[in-house]
A protein has these predicted regions:
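Asp-based, Mg2+/Mn2+-dependent phosphohydrolase catalytic module
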Residues: 1-5, 96, 111, 115-213
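N-terminal helical cap/lid subdomain that shapes the substrate entry/recognition surface
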Residues: 2-100
Length: 213
């Protein structure tokens, strides 16, 4: 493989453990309309999908309330839910390790809350490009975001790698022809599997062990 020149990160489940925030945020939408809290299937869904699809899914049994549910979720202050998020402990160390040798980007199905997270956790300086669901016509798993990132840096898919944790991420990377590092998900079909960021520094993709001249 050619030299690694680009590392692209998913946000939820990779940069942050955000299930707690998603749980409280979407349960608040359900509670507001007098409905029971989400089950595990619904929690898994909202953890992987962007906010519009997520609200559509959790309110699928009450279609007459859907428009009101979207209006209500837009009125919620996401800062109230940040306290339920945990940054991966070695994320910053890994970012400092790979920059400036590798270009860095984010591809996420978050929307407006991504900028808030980057600012609150002082991460914006580490990422050269951020693609959210509102920046593309086709959110993940469609490859649009990754293809636009590659085009921005004038790189080929084999020169980059994507770090994700879900089936949506697996399909996203595969559709773009990019290698995948599965983060804390040993069941995901991927080129590599890790449980922490600094483990990545020892992978062949980082050490040059998989490089061909």
């Amino acid at each position: 493989m050619p030299e690694l020149k680009l590392v692209v990160f998913d946000c939820d489940g990779v940069m942050f453990d955000s299930k707690g925030a998603n749980l409280h945020f979407y349960n608040q939408v359900r509670r507001h309309f007098g409905h029971p809290e989400m089950d595990e299937e619904e929690l898994d869904y909202v953890h992987m999908h962007h906010v519009i699809d997520s609200v559509n899914f959790i309110m699928r049994h009450w279609p007459t309330e859907l428009a009101a549910a979207h209006a209500y979720r837009q009125s919620l202050d996401y800062k109230e839910y940040i306290r339920h998020m945990t940054i991966e402990p070695d994320l910053v160390e890994f970012l400092q390790y790979i920059t400036p040798d590798c270009r860095t980007a984010i591809s996420t199905n978050r929307t407006t809350t991504m900028a808030l997270l980057l600012d609150l956790f002082n991460l914006r300086r580490y990422f050269e490009m951020v693609m959210t669901a509102q920046d593309v016509a086709n959110p993940k798993p469609h490859p649009e975001a990754l293809l636009r990132i590659l085009a921005h840096f004038n790189l080929r898919p084999e020169e980059g790698i994507f770090i994700g944790d879900s089936v949506v991420d697996m399909e996203h990377a595969g559709a773009a022809g990019m290698r995948l590092i599965a983060f804390k998900n040993p069941e995901l079909a991927a080129d590599y599997h890790v449980d922490s960021f600094m483990e990545i520094t020892r992978l062949p993709v980082m050490t040059g062990g998989d490089r061909t001249e």
